[in-house]
From Swiss-Prot:
PANTHER family: FORMATE-DEPENDENT PHOSPHORIBOSYLGLYCINAMIDE FORMYLTRANSFERASE (PTHR43055:SF1). This is Formate-dependent phosphoribosylglycinamide formyltransferase. Involved in the de novo purine biosynthesis. Catalyzes the transfer of formate to 5-phospho-ribosyl-glycinamide (GAR), producing 5-phospho-ribosyl-N-formylglycinamide (FGAR). Formate is provided by PurU via hydrolysis of 10-formyl-tetrahydrofolate. Homodimer. The gene is purT. Gene3D superfamilies: 3.40.50.20, ATP-grasp fold, A domain, ATP-grasp fold, B domain. It holds the Pfam family RS_preATP-grasp-like.
């Protein structure tokens, strides 16, 4: 493996499709390894735009615009960091030999919506999941619930991110509202939802799974320690590592994650979401990229999920070792405003073993994730207390 010099004829060029806070960290990790990075997003001054060598603003669901940009920039690798991408065009780009898609164009296409990956996991691989059906109309949704899914259940757009459009239904009175909310929350392909039966789980985890080359050049699967997390409305608000699990549950979680990521193939880090009850484990979702709950790895592992993704992408060896217990807590914008400021940083960073990441998003919304606090501790409980305390000290303000 050779890496050249950025901004020179020898440069290794990587294009990130999606330049949010997770993409920003991947860009920084790639640049530390001498890679020339092109960041692409749908709006100007996205977090990753602020640190990349070059930045572009396009609609990534526009296949023609995407191909034109790839032909212009000539990246060696394309790294999708979001779901809303013209994945059919990625398949064409890869088939034409214009660039290698990470982990593969097929993986990007399958995981761009919940239908593709759920059918792969449950119907092709036979992995345990919640009971589910897909619906294209309010009537189909009601029929799916009445036909066996039952209440309580969860309705999600087949394509959305960060919990957008997701609802918990406790009875018939919730169906219309959930359908309307899902239609407004989906990124594309609006009007199709997945309805899932509720699993009585003890906790949910993200198992960061890395497919990387070893010193012999073979792709090997590695696992990080499990990450526990709390979600509100489908959106992560805090995470911690490690999450205590029984040996049997951990082994089953790793088996499920290996089966899914092995089928998707390629190189890179995958965020595999799982439900756990005792020794039983159910597959929920997978993202072929760093996961928001994995922000905790900025303080808990020797190499963060972003550094692991960068190394795996480049065909380099990885080390998934846990360094010490850590936790993360989200900092919300709290207001509808452009160009907000943040106060209370002195108090936040006075919390023992704490650190902050302010993402630099150009516009704040009340529940938009604008930053994260991370902290270490003697235990995950202590780390969680510190991370939440540090996050609570940060006060978004109008300038």
């Amino acid at each position: 493996m050779k890496i050249g010099t950025p901004l020179s004829p020898s440069a290794l060029r990587v294009m990130l499709l999606g330049a949010g806070e997770l993409g920003k960290e991947v860009i920084i990790a790639l640049q530390r390894l001498g890679v020339e990075v092109i960041a692409v997003d749908r709006y100007e001054n996205a977090p990753g735009h602020q640190v990349a060598h070059r930045a572009h603003v396009i609609s990534m669901t526009d296949g023609a615009a995407l191909r034109q940009l790839v032909e212009q920039e000539k990246p060696h690798l394309i790294v999708p960091e979001i779901e809303a991408i013209a994945t059919d065009m990625l398949v064409e780009i890869e088939a034409a030999g214009l660039a290698e898609v990470i982990p593969t164009a097929r993986a990007a296409k399958l995981t761009m919506n919940r239908e593709g990956i759920r059918r792969l996991a449950a119907e092709e691989l036979g992995l345990p999941t919640s009971p589910y059906k897909f619906a294209d109309s309010l009537a189909e949704l009601q029929a799916a619930i009445d036909g066996g899914i039952g209440y309580p259940c969860i309705v999600k757009p087949t394509m959305s991110s960060s919990g957008k459009g997701q609802s918990l239904l406790r009875g018939p009175d919730d169906v219309q509202k959930a359908w309307d909310y899902a239609a407004s929350g989906g990124r594309v392909n609006q009007g199709r939802v997945i309805v899932e039966g509720f699993i009585d789980f003890d906790y949910e985890i993200t198992l960061l799974t890395v497919r990387a080359r070893d010193t012999a050049g073979e792709v090997v699967t590695h696992f990080c320690e499990p990450i526990g997390h709390v979600q509100v409305g489908g959106d992560y608000v805090e995470s911690w590592q490690p999450q205590a699990m029984s040996p049997a549950a951990l082994q089953r979680a790793q088996e499920i994650a290996a089966a899914v990521t092995g089928n998707l193939g390629g190189r890179g880090l995958f965020g595999v979401e799982l439900f756990v009850k005792g020794d039983m484990v159910w597959f929920s979702e997978v993202s072929p990229r760093p996961h928001d709950t994995g922000l905790v790895t900025l303080c808990s592992q020797r190499f963060s999920e972003f550094e692991l993704h960068a190394r795996a992408i480049l065909g380099l060896p990885v080390d998934t070792a846990l360094r010490e217990a850590g936790a993360s807590a989200v900092i919300y914008g709290g207001m509808e405003e452009k160009g907000i400021a943040f106060a209370g940083l002195e108090e936040a960073l006075a919390v023992p073993r704490s650190d902050l990441r302010l993402f630099g998003k150009p516009e704040s919304f009340k529940k938009r994730r604008m930053g994260v606090a991370v902290a270490n501790g003697e235990s995950t409980d202590q780390a969680r207390e510190r991370a939440k305390l540090a996050a609570s000290k940060v006060r978004p303000t109008r300038t």
